[in-house]
């Protein structure tokens, strides 16, 4: 609409300018005298022509524009321009002539006659008229050409404006159509937003309907598939029946109907009976399941009750163990005080101290600090002895020692101080417990090693006994000595125990700890082949006498070593769980000197002489009863594998029916 308004304003301005130009032209025509009629006529003619042209041009606005008139107008305009150029030149020439004539007239007026003047005036008048006419024609032509040119320009502008108006109108129509479409779309969108819940509800309903249809279709498919399977199974059954009937029809050796019916009746009765049995068994299974479930529930309840009872008992056991530990600590504290008092007593009496070697110090450090109660419990932890005689003597010695210590304790407890620091008590207790644990571990390792070695030796010698032929060798043992020697041995052992207790009180102020009697070394006899193998010689090589000499030499060494060890440990009261005898051989002299000095200080010089005289006899007397006890509990054809000090070449072999009990002879299988 804005473009149309602009076009209207432009058209109005154009027509206003044309009217002004026409007014100017009319004023110019009125001013020019004499030429008014000609100009009017020419204007009228031109107006008529222009009117016709304007009509033609207005008619052509709707259709197409005539470019031929423009061509003609251009040609006329060119001619008019040429005339415009020629006219001023002619005018200048005429002016010059007119001026020349005036000058000539002024100079020679007197000479010219009147007639000549009349003719000359007429010619001048005619020339002037002609000039004025030419000027009027030129002006009129010029005015007409300018008007035509302007009219044509205005027509062209009008045509352009009409084209623009048409384009703008079409654009407006298209824009109106688009606006209508947009308005419709916006209205639909707004309506859709308002109708969203309805649309969603419709969509959900459609989805539900489709799902129901799917389910129905799936159910139909399933039913159809089942029906197809059933029909297939029926077809197969019918085919089987047909085949069976065909075979029956083809068989010519069939029985009669009565027999077949009788068989069928029997089979049906059996089937019925089987069905009844199956039903009864199913009922029994159900009943049994119920009964078992009840029993399981009862048993679970019992187990829960037992678990609760066990938990309560465990709690009680823990409380009791704590109480026992507290009592043990109290007893240990009392023992610690007693040992301290003994130490103080010995210090006051100026008891002489004896220097000890490194071996003795190591043995004393290994000894644990135990209480009175632990002495009773650790009797069972001592490694098992090879004979009953050793066990009996060990138990007797322990009982005697415990009684002596129990007699000494009440005298010492009366002298204890009533107030002691708690820190010292607990430190002593922790130290004792640590030493006990260390000793138990050492003993357990020693026992395990001994057991392993004994088992290996058993296997080896059983194989050797199976492979080698038996040879009987008579070994003559010394006869038993008198009961006085046994009494001396016991007294000697008691005194050695007392001496060990005094040494412990002097060194560390703790309760003494002693093991049972010593293990005895076993003496074993081997064949020449085994002896040669032990010495690195071939089994068959070497004379028999050399083997016997080696055997006798080795047995003599073992006997001497055993006697020395028994003497030393009987005085010291300590027996290592595992080790070798080489250490004791090297330090034999120093140990004997210390032993003799201690015995002189404790019991006097006379006791040392008695012990020196009775030591070989005592050793023999102690060996004979122990060896005699070893032979009785073990059955024949069995060998005891326990040994002492890790000796790998020695095993005991039982005797076969001793020839006489008084002589003390034994026959040993090699």
Swiss-Prot record:
UniProt feature, compositional bias: Polar residues: 38-51, 651-662
Keyword Coiled coil: yes
Organism expressing this protein natively: Homo sapiens (Human)
Pfam families tied to this protein: Lebercilin
Any Gene Ontology CC annotation: axoneme
Region listing for Disordered, in residue ranges: 30-51, 374-393, 495-516, 557-580, 609-670
Gene from which the chain derives: LCA5L
Alphabetically ordered keywords of this record: Coiled coil
Keyword Magnesium: no
Top-level taxon of the source organism: Eukaryota
UniProt GO BP: intraciliary transport
Bias kind Basic and acidic residues: ranges: 560-572, 621-632
Family: Belongs to the LCA5 family.
Protein name: Lebercilin-like protein
Coiled coil: 148-259, 305-336, 420-440
InterPro entries: Lebercilin-like (IPR026188), Lebercilin_dom (IPR028933)
């Amino acid at each position: 609409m804005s473009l149309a308004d602009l076009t209207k304003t432009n058209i109005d301005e154009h027509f206003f300018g044309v009217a002004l130009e026409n007014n100017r032209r009319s004023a110019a025509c009125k001013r020019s005298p004499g030429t008014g009629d000609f100009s009017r006529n020419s204007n009228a003619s031109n107006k008529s022509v222009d009117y016709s042209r304007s009509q033609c041009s207005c008619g052509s606005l709707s259709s197409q524009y005539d470019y031929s008139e423009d061509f003609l107008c251009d040609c006329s305009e060119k001619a008019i321009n040429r005339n415009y150029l020629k006219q001023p030149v002619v005018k200048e020439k005429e002016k010059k002539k007119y001026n020349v004539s005036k000058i000539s007239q002024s100079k020679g007026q007197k000479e010219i006659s009147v007639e000549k003047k009349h003719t000359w005036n007429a010619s001048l008048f005619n020339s002037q008229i002609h000039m004025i006419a030419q000027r009027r024609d030129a002006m009129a032509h010029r005015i007409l050409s300018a008007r035509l040119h302007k009219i044509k320009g205005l027509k062209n502008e009008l045509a352009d404006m009409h084209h623009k108006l048409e384009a703008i109108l079409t654009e407006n129509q298209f824009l109106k159509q688009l606006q209508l479409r947009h308005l419709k779309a916006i209205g639909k969108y707004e309506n859709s937003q308002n109708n969203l819940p309805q649309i969603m509800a419709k969509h959900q309903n459609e989805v539900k309907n489709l799902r129901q249809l799917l389910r129905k279709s799936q159910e139909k498919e399933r039913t159809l598939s089942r029906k197809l399977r059933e029909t297939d199974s029926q077809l197969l059954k019918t085919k089987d029946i047909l085949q069976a009937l065909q075979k029956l029809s083809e068989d010519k050796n069939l029985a009669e109907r009565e027999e077949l019916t009788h068989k069928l009746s029997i089979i049906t009765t059996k089937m019925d009976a089987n069905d009844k049995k199956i039903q009864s068994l199913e009922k029994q299974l159900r009943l049994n399941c119920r009964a078992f479930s009840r029993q399981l529930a009862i048993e679970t309840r019992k187990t829960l009750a037992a678990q609760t009872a066990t938990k309560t008992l465990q709690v009680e056991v823990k409380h009791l163990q704590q109480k026992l530990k507290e009592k043990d600590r109290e007893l240990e504290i009392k023992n610690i005080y007693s040992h301290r008092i003994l130490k103080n007593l010995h210090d006051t009496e100026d008891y002489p101290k004896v220097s000890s070697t490194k071996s003795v110090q190591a043995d004393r450090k290994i000894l644990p600090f135990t209480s009175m109660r632990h002495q009773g419990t650790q009797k069972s932890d001592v490694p098992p002895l090879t004979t009953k005689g050793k066990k009996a003597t060990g138990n007797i010695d322990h009982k005697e020692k415990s009684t002596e210590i129990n007699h000494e304790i009440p005298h010492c407890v009366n002298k204890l101080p009533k107030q002691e620091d708690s820190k010292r008590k607990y430190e002593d207790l922790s130290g004792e417990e640590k030493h006990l644990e260390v000793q138990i571990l050492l003993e357990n390792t020693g026992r395990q090693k001994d057991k392993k070695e004994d088992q290996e030796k058993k296997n080896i010698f059983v194989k050797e006994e199976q492979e080698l032929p038996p040879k009987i060798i008579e070994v003559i043992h010394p006869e038993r000595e008198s009961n006085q020697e046994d009494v001396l041995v016991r007294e000697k052992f008691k005194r050695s125990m007392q001496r060990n207790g005094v040494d412990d009180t002097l060194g560390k102020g703790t309760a003494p700890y002693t093991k049972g009697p010593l293990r005895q070394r076993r003496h074993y006899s081997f064949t020449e082949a085994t002896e040669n193998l032990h010495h690195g010689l071939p089994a068959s090589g070497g004379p028999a006498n050399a083997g016997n000499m080696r055997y006798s030499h080795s047995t003599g060494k073992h006997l001497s070593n055993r006697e020395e060890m028994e003497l030393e440990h009987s005085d010291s009261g300590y027996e290592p769980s595992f080790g070798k005898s080489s250490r004791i051989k090297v330090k034999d002299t120093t140990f004997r000197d210390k032993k003799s000095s201690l015995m002189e200080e404790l019991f006097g010089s006379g006791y040392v002489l008695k012990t020196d005289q009775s030591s070989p006899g005592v050793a023999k007397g102690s060996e004979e009863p122990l060896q005699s006890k070893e032979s009785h509990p073990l059955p024949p054809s069995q060998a005891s594998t326990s040994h002492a000090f890790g000796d790998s070449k020695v095993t005991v072999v039982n005797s076969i029916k001793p020839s006489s009990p008084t002589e003390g002879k034994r026959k040993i299988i090699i």
